[in-house]
Amino acid sequence: SGGCVIMGTAAGPLTELAQMLNLPVTNTLMGLGGYPGADRQFLGMLGMHGSFTANLAMHHSDVILAVGARFDDRVINGAAKFCPNAKIIHIDIDPASFSKTIKADIAIVGPVDSVLTEMVAIVREIGETPNQDAQAAWWKQIDEWRGNRGLFPYDKGDGSIIKPQTV
């Protein structure tokens, strides 16, 4: 999620949709705070200043729901390599935001809070959930990435000396 989640007061419906569908969530720098950072489904910020887990999850995704994100150069790190196998659904209030740097397979124009609220209602009405076996395998992979490199990928030592990177 990007800055429009914050500006469009869409954190509530974004959180509700992600939790209903058990989806992993990443944020851009401008979108930080748009999803609870302590929630298990939050993978961290993506891009050059983001987490290893968030970047790998995005890269290996089959579908990306981009909510109010700009796809700037610090996030995509080269359009040709960005999420090569993903279908991208992009929600934004500004139609000029679509396909500037990353092609949107589906572009949804509208206020992000209204669009997400409607999506929540549709998911409730349909009553279907994602394939649980596929989703369990995906979360297992994400948890493996978290365990390997997480937010603290360095050796913390034996604890007798505090290393600068732990502060």
List PLM regions with ranges.
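Short glycine- and Lys/Arg-enriched binding-loop motifs that mark or flank ligand-binding interfaces
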Residues: N27-L29, R40-L46, I64, T101, ...
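Active-site rim loops that border cofactor/substrate pockets in soluble metabolic enzymes
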Residues: G31-G50, A57
